[in-house]
């Protein structure tokens, strides 16, 4: 902080305190008004998590427990996982991609990475999303469409062949088979000599997605 900024700090604090007092008076006047008006009886107002909702929120509510947010790069990571946020590192650039066989998609990933993409986002085909192998009768006509077909560890190895998994983060959009796909990914990384502690990315575990 510069000397000028330090010198002006008391004035800014005083102005902020005045603004808080003004807002408190405004909130009190509003609550007095609401108390005189009829409301629906027997109705509970909650959000989707069934938590009760106040009639209105203001900046004053932010002052209730601000220390719980922590600092950028520190637990509980409410303010991001990077200490410098996006000033020191841009967000990951990744195109949702996947089609045909694992080798087809592998070539696409290498194409994207060579042109500046900084992460991978795997699109799986419908049989993979539903947990069916490519040779299952229910997979007929859907293999490799709208995503890559992954039926085995060998497929996962082909998908990331020549792509060092300790140097790229991977986002995988999957349904119920998430646990199996994750194990495939970890095993493929280990075969590259990459320990699980060096892996980056996310995996979706949403059985209602498709």
PLM regions: where:
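Catalytic alpha/beta active-site cores
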Residues: 2-210
């Amino acid at each position: 902080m510069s000397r000028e900024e330090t010198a002006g700090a008391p004035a800014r604090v005083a102005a902020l305190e005045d603004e808080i007092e003004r807002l408190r008076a405004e909130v009190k006047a509003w609550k007095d008004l609401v108390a005189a008006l009829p409301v629906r009886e027997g109705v509970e107002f909650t959000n989707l998590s069934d938590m009760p909702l106040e009639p209105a929120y203001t900046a004053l509510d932010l002052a209730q427990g601000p220390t719980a947010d922590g600092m950028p790069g520190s637990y509980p990571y409410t303010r991001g996982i990077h200490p410098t946020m996006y000033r020191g590192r841009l967000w990951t650039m990744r195109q949702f991609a996947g089609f045909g066989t694992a080798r087809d998609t592998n070539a696409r990933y290498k194409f994207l990475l060579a042109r500046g993409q900084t992460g991978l986002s795997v699109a799986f085909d419908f049989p993979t999303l539903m947990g069916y192998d490519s040779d299952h009768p229910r997979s007929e006509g859907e293999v490799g469409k709208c995503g890559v077909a992954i039926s085995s560890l060998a497929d996962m190895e082909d998908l990331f062949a020549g792509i060092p998994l300790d140097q790229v983060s991977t986002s995988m959009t999957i349904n119920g088979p998430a646990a199996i796909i994750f194990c495939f990914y970890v095993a493929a990384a280990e075969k590259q000599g990459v320990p699980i502690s060096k892996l980056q990315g996310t995996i979706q575990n949403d059985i209602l997605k498709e």
